[in-house]
Curated annotation (Swiss-Prot):
Similarity comment: Belongs to the LipB family.
GO CC list: cytoplasm
Keywords: Acyltransferase, Cytoplasm, Transferase
PROSITE patterns tied to this protein: BPL_LPL_CATALYTIC (PS51733), LIPB (PS01313)
Record-given protein name: Octanoyltransferase
More details: In the reaction, the free carboxyl group of octanoic acid is attached via an amide linkage to the epsilon-amino group of a specific lysine residue of lipoyl domains of lipoate-dependent enzymes.
């Protein structure tokens, strides 16, 4: 199905792209955003990445303490340094903010609250911090976000730690904070298939972002 389908602003395509190199998806997000116009349907891209550290626009190399053989990519999202790896569920948010009448702060709230909704459904208590975007459990970060807005449209997105090797986080200062601890769902006693987490979080994202007509696009197919 072509991305320029004649539908309303409440339509959202959801794709599962599987395991993909970070650079490949980053370039695809930029290309999608450059090419999109008023007829382009908004999309969510679910993805996993092989191990990689990413430095955002505000990223300082002093927060890369011992990267070892894990590659480092300097990218154009907001924020500092983070880690992506297998067992982490990442959703990229490709949304026309002007069309949805959303400000960046409203978008950040919607993304964080979607994770809060999900974790509350698992009976996990959460917190948010005004000075450190993301979602925290027992004082440890479980979800991070970083966005870029270009001509009123956003890309990049949100990552949720599901069942992963957390040790690379301790080779950096996560999000620029020395000593910040992280956690995942598995360590909270929730051993869930990644696909189930993605499906459930998609439902909360759709609700918080105000879409009424979500549908699933091509599985495991990179955008051209």
């Amino acid at each position: 199905m072509d991305k320029r389908i004649p539908v309303g602003a409440d339509t959202l395509r959801i794709r599962n792209l599987g395991l993909q190199d970070y650079d490949t998806v980053w370039q695809a997000m930029r290309d999608f955003t450059v090419r999109r116009d008023s007829a382009t349907v908004d999309e969510l891209w679910w993805v996993e990445h092989p191990p990689v550290f990413t430095l955002g626009l505000n990223g300082q190399e002093c927060h890369l303490r011992d990267v070892g053989d894990i590659p480092v990519v300097r990218c154009d999202r907001g924020g500092q340094v983070t880690y992506h790896g297998p067992g982490q569920s990442i959703v990229y948010i490709l949304v026309d903010l002007r069309r949805r009448a959303l400000g960046v702060r409203q978008l950040v709230d919607a993304l964080e609250l979607s994770v809060v909704d999900l974790l509350q459904s698992y009976e996990i208590e959460t917190e948010r911090r005004a000075n450190a975007p993301g979602v925290y459990v027992q004082g440890r970060k479980i979800a991070s976000l970083g966005l870029r807005v270009r001509k009123g449209c956003c890309y990049h997105g949100l990552s949720l730690n599901v069942a992963m090797d957390l040790s690379p986080f301790y080779r950096i200062d996560p999000c620029g904070y020395s000593g910040m601890e992280v956690i995942d769902l598995k360590r909270l006693g929730m051993e869930l298939p990644l696909a189930d987490v993605q499906q459930n979080l998609s439902r909360y994202l759709v609700r918080r972002l105000g879409y009424s007509a979500p549908f699933y696009g091509e599985e495991n197919r990179m955008i051209k």
